[in-house]
UniProtKB/Swiss-Prot annotation:
GO terms for cellular component: cytoplasm. Keywords: Cytoplasm, Hydrolase, Metal-binding, Nucleotide-binding. Its cofactor is a divalent metal cation. GO terms for molecular function: 3'-nucleotidase activity; 5'-nucleotidase activity; exopolyphosphatase activity; metal ion binding; nucleotide binding. It comes from the Bacteria. This is 5'/3'-nucleotidase SurE. Binds 1 divalent metal cation per subunit. It is found in: Cytoplasm.
Amino acid sequence: MRILLSNDDGVHAPGIQTLAKALREFADVQVVAPDRNRSGASNSLTLESSLRTFTFENGDIAVQMGTPTDCVYLGVNALMRPRPDIVVSGINAGPNLGDDVIYSGTVAAAMEGRHLGFPALAVSLDGHKHYDTAAAVTCSILRALCKEPLRTGRILNINVQDLPLDQIKGIRVTRCGTRHPADQVIPQQDPRGNTLYWIGPPGGKCDAGPGTDFAAVDEGYVSITPLHVDLTAHSAQDVVSDWLNSVGVGTQW
């Protein structure tokens, strides 16, 4: 199995390095990751400037000022030859649950892999300690995929509780929960008196009931949520069409 491995925490982050070490025990792994933390970069691409890369002695590649999506795009289309069999993103330091997937560079890297035609996993740890647990879970899933490919055409967003492996209860297939809207902005002043702003933490849990990714992780399970790239709200199409007809938009300007 050939694996393109990326993340949004940066090429030297403990999550990606722990996972790369574990994956290399049974797979051909190419790390292509940002040279710095790009958390929250979502699906952004660098289009108005060139991208430089640096290759370390162990073969890992850092994309200077690159986003997670840049890294996967370059990895698939230029840097990994032959091309990968699968794209894996993570292990993220912190969860990507519920609405987090909108902003997550970890999920975005996997989404870019899927957009380019490859199976893809995004892996996050609900903490900053037991990366080995998340790595073991990921390796188990990838070994299973080698034996029997999963042909859903979807991204698997995997969240692992920050526990020793023997305390993980199992795996649940879940849906995304939701958070309350975030509203915190943290102002500061620089030495010259100019105001600086920091984006605050995410909103608290809103829909975290049974069946959600929040609930599974809180209860000590691994959460696997299938995600897809198509954002069309199919159930709303008829509602919008009926509304346009009723208000006359499109018939009178």
